[in-house]
């Protein structure tokens, strides 16, 4: 019994790293980013870049101030920035998005020990704080650029409801 070794997980060693996992998540989120740029315009891309950059800067600064090793290369801050940007209205002022990034990275993620140690999802917690702080901005959503005229939008169960039986017979 003296050879029993008790260690924390993970017990299986593999070549998968945090950086590879986060890169896979970023790649998986790219179609959603392309769609948001197509639907909401270039501001969606700018919002995503600002959120990703802010999250990386806040993580770097926080790790530097706390005298911990640099972890920005694991790309988890970029994933947090993308997830937060995807959860914000495209019309939100950029400084408010940066406040959400600060809450997500510094308060929720880094103050509780970094990746894997946080008590909640950092991006969603940042959104909740923004929702509580800036309710009017967070509940106003942009009309998509894609729909140029009202005829392209169908909000009823079927477009045939607007047709009369006489016009259908013609």
Which ranges hold each PLM region?
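Charge-biased, low-complexity intrinsically disordered regions
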Residues: 64-65, 69, 83-84, 88, ...
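Long hydrophobic alpha-helical segments that form multi-pass transmembrane helix bundles
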Residues: 117, 122-170
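N-terminal signal-anchor module of multipass membrane proteins
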Residues: 1-56
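Cytoplasmic-side transmembrane-helix entry/capping segments in multi-pass membrane proteins
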Residues: 70-80, 97-102, 117-128
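C-terminal ends of transmembrane helices
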Residues: 57-68, 105-116
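Transmembrane helix interruption/hinge and helix-loop junction motifs
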Residues: 38-44, 88-97
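Hydrophobic, membrane-inserted alpha-helices
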Residues: 28-35, 55-59, 77-85, 101-108
